[in-house]
Amino acid sequence: MSKPIKIEQGIKYRDADKMALIPVRNVAEEAPKEVLRKPAWMKIKLPSDSKRIQEIKSALRKNKLHSVCEEASCPNLAECFNHGTATFMILGAICTRRCPFCDVAHGRPLPPNAEEPSHLAQTIADMKLKYVVITSVDRDDLRDGGAQHFVDCIREIREKSPEIHIETLVPDFRGRMDRALDILQGTPPNVFNHNLETAPRLYRKARPGANYQWSLDLLKNFKEIHPEVPTKSGVMMGLGETKEEIIQVLKDLRAHGVTMLTLGQYLAPSRHHLPVERYVPPAEFDELKEIALELGFTHAACGPFVRSSYHADLQAQGLEIK
């Protein structure tokens, strides 16, 4: 038997090391021997000019900021960076959770950087962004789950960029929802996003430490406090869910007041993560979009490369995203 890994503060644990820390044994050791080959519709054409990409990466490093685009190995990084957009990840780059679908590092994070809100706001102002998405790692080590840091960032951003629209993609604030919502109450974003990620049957496998109903309640409770702010959620496909399960997730979201939806294809970051069970054809995403609109979603971005913050500004305008 191998010795347990000693988690040291500030150290990133990824891939095999991260998976070894997950109490639910269902990842690499139970993965299929043959990895599914990507179909033609999953091929990405990289931009020929990477100058803008390097400029954004340099700006992030200069201001000691993180993007979820990089930390989560998003397949759309090149496209988004090349168009001058990024989803900023606050509260560090080490997550207290260890979800086996996610490429963000796990470990014991350092205390929040008090200068991050001002650095973030200045970077956004320098980039002249009109729409920005702010997300974070899970911070179960903080009494408010990081809610005050979100508020500090929103305030600083709006002070330097008064016309900007801010979307927050928040964690579930496990065990501290009421406290977090109370803190957020005075400084709400323009869009409040929290991802369900998958069907409830797959939570033990894909989201150990999370609870499906808790996440739904977070979305519902925020909406009750701020009925004027759209709520949004994202779901991955290809983890072993059925079409019927996804439709039920959509119904649950609508029953809890959510009006904005993203559906995208799950891609395994490495062989150590949960394997892709199925590549969902574009036509099936189109069908699910029609179902979502029939259920009452006002915005539904559905397609293989759709991610929660992919072209979030266009999503908010209701434009078609695939």
Swiss-Prot record:
> Could you give the cofactor binding note from the entry?
Binds 2 [4Fe-4S] clusters per subunit. One cluster is coordinated with 3 cysteines and an exchangeable S-adenosyl-L-methionine.
Question: Gene Ontology terms, cellular component aspect?
Answer: cytoplasm
Give binding positions for [4Fe-4S] cluster 2: 95, 99, 102
Q: Name one GO molecular function term.
A: 4 iron, 4 sulfur cluster binding
Query: Where in or outside the cell?
Result: Cytoplasm
User: What InterPro entries does this protein's entry cite?
Assistant: Aldolase_TIM (IPR013785), Elp3/MiaA/NifB-like_rSAM (IPR006638), LIAS_N (IPR031691), Lipoyl_synth (IPR003698), rSAM (IPR007197)
| Main localization (coarse) | cytoplasm
Concerning Pfam families, the annotation shows: LIAS_N, Radical_SAM
- What cofactor requirement does the entry state? [4Fe-4S] cluster
- Annotated coiled-coil positions are none
What keywords is this UniProt entry annotated with? Answer: 4Fe-4S, Cytoplasm, Iron, Iron-sulfur, Metal-binding, S-adenosyl-L-methionine, Transferase
> What SMART domains is this protein classified in?
Elp3 (SM00729)
Residue ranges of domain Radical SAM core in the record: 81-298
User: EC number(s) in its UniProt entry?
Assistant: 2.8.1.8
Q: What are the binding positions for [4Fe-4S] cluster 1 in this chain?
A: 69, 74, 80, 309
Q: Reaction(s) catalyzed by this protein?
A: [[Fe-S] cluster scaffold protein carrying a second [4Fe-4S](2+) cluster] + N(6)-octanoyl-L-lysyl-[protein] + 2 oxidized [2Fe-2S]-[ferredoxin] + 2 S-adenosyl-L-methionine + 4 H(+) = [[Fe-S] cluster scaffold protein] + N(6)-[(R)-dihydrolipoyl]-L-lysyl-[protein] + 4 Fe(3+) + 2 hydrogen sulfide + 2 5'-deoxyadenosine + 2 L-methionine + 2 reduced [2Fe-2S]-[ferredoxin]
Write out the pathway annotation from the protein's UniProt entry: Protein modification; protein lipoylation via endogenous pathway; protein N(6)-(lipoyl)lysine from octanoyl-[acyl-carrier-protein]: step 2/2
Q: Which domain of life is it from?
A: Bacteria
EC class (word)? transferase
Of which family is this protein a member?
Belongs to the radical SAM superfamily. Lipoyl synthase family.
Name this polypeptide is given: Lipoyl synthase
Q: Which organism is it from?
A: Photobacterium profundum (strain SS9)
